[in-house]
Amino acid sequence: MKTTNHSSNLTLIVAVSENDVIGKDNDLIWHLKNDLKRFKALTSGHCIIMGRKTFESFPKPLPNRTHIVITRQQNYKAPEGVIIVNSLEAAIKKAEQDTNPFIIGGGEIYKQALNVVDIIEFTRVHHSFEGDTFFPVISETIWKETDRIFHKKDDLHKFDFSYITYKRR
């Protein structure tokens, strides 16, 4: 059930292993060049909403995107142009001028966002990994798969992976 009203296509974007791992020690575990290109192509020019730890995992803010960072820390210092809020609801409100804002992590933010997003852009990495951050199971009663593209591993991609788009039923 959706719990927040918004007029845009609020999209969650995530890469998930076969055993639902999304990260370890606040970092990505795998490097899939085409998945990173897809992330850039989809999110470029849009608001990206993330938790503080996800933001701090970047060497610097990502170009051509409006960063909205959720943190409980009072007086959190961020680079100029980065918007700081204290809740997912406040982040969505700050992104309301964007027709397609993205939720980009991390684990706690994803759990909250599943209740409010319209679309999930999901990369399934066809391999199991050890990790400490997991993505919840996607319920088929709430989400409908609308697109799937399989990519075989190759010289640039150590693992098979699939792009899957889910839309809220």
Predicted segments with their positions:
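Enzymes that bind and transform nitrogen-containing heteroaromatic metabolites
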Residues: 2-169
